[in-house]
Design a protein with these regions (language model features):
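An N-terminal hydrophobic leader/cap segment in hydrolases
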Residues: 1-33, 37-46
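Short beta-strand element of the alpha/beta-hydrolase
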Residues: 51-59
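Catalytic nucleophile-loop/oxyanion-hole region of alpha/beta-hydrolase
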Residues: 61-64, 90-124
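Conserved alpha/beta-hydrolase
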Residues: 71-95
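Alpha/beta-hydrolase-fold enzymes
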Residues: 131-218
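Short beta-strand/loop motif that positions the catalytic acidic residue
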Residues: 240, 246-248, 252
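Short alpha-helix in the alpha/beta-hydrolase fold that links the catalytic acid
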Residues: 242, 256-265
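Catalytic active-site module of serine/aspartate enzymes centered on a nucleophile-bearing elbow/loop
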Residues: 273-306
Length: 306
């Protein structure tokens, strides 16, 4: 949609105001994981109980508040939309940007998908992952392919974090390698830059004031997720059987666009689609006119729900 979202200093970390469609609802919930940790969860429900359902997984340092406007748009297009904050991010439980075991994230996503599947038993379930979330949905789909009855009707990888364009400094790289292998919780400043994330000045203002934005991650997190988990994503991509839509912004200077195309070509999905968007930055949820992307995502989901 073409958006007129503006920075609102009173709504920290919120890009857009969540709204419920006619006959639907918007709620903020807390989802309890098997180990007792609670995930902050935003839920947009469509008027039709059998509408397709989308689980939207954010990227590194982000949180669900960045996707309010996009979720509003997808909900208005006839989808139920669930957007969690990952463990250790945003308003969810967990040490900030820290883990000693990358496997906690696939486990969390699996538990969440199980819960959504129980709630939306008459709905087709899809998962969209932005950046780091693209890794998470790939693992989820690879695991799902081994099930007798898969949960996912399809996945969408949006500017997936397959390979960086800008890397950590040499000193921080050594810190991640040696500290990460020891499970160090020492925080490492990741090379975030609002100017590379988005060209939207209103979104840049929101980001610069966002106290929920995780601008640092621990050496252990970057080792476990950024190196170990991400290092296996191509192998997991080969195991994906579900239909897949891969989207890449042509203005993205955060992740490697050739690596995204290689990821697409590696996917084991027989039904796969690759789409690019001229001028779209890495954090395309902040585009001033995101209508082409939102329409394509909704149309693809509806087509695969028939």
């Amino acid at each position: 949609m073409a958006t007129d979202v503006r920075y609102d200093a009173e709504r920290v970390g919120e890009w857009g105001t969540p709204v419920a469609v006619a006959g639907g609802s918007y709620t903020v919930e807390s989802f309890t994981l098997p180990d007792g940790a609670k995930l902050h969860l935003r839920v947009w429900r469509a008027a039709n109980p059998a509408a397709p359902t989308l689980a939207l997984l954010h990227g590194l340092g982000a949180h669900s508040g960045w996707f309010n406007d996009m979720a509003n748009s997808l909900n208005a297009a006839g989808l139920h939309v669930y957007v969690p904050d990952h463990r250790g991010f945003g308003r969810s439980d967990g040490e900030r940007g820290h883990t000693r075991d990358w496997r906690s994230y696939p486990a969390d996503v699996s538990a969440l998908l199980d819960e959504i599947g129980r709630r939306e038993a008459n709905s087709k379930l899809f998962a969209l992952g932005h950046s780091m979330g693209g890794i998470f949905v790939t693992y989820a789909a690879a695991e799902d392919a081994k099930r007798v009855t898969p949960r996912l009707a399809g996945i969408i990888a949006m500017n997936p974090w397959i390979k960086n364009v800008t890397n950590l400094s040499l000193g921080n790289t050594f810190s991640v390698l040696f500290g990460g292998m020891r499970g160090s919780s020492r925080q490492v400043i990741y090379p975030y830059d609002v100017n590379t994330m988005t060209k939207n000045p209103e979104a840049q203002r929101m980001l610069e004031a966002d106290t929920y934005w995780g601008k640092t991650q621990s050496a252990s997190f970057l080792y476990q997720v950024g190196l170990r988990m991400r290092g296996q994503v191509m192998a997991r991509a080969k195991e994906v059987h579900a239909p897949a839509l891969v989207v890449q912004g042509e203005g993205d200077v955060v992740v490697s666009q050739p690596a995204t195309k290689q990821y697409f070509e590696t996917l084991g999905s027989a039904d796969r689609t690759f789409k690019t968007y001229p001028g779209y930055s890495h954090d395309c949820e902040f585009e001033t006119d995101r209508s082409a992307l939102d329409q394509d995502i909704a149309a693809w989901i509806h087509a695969h729900s028939a």
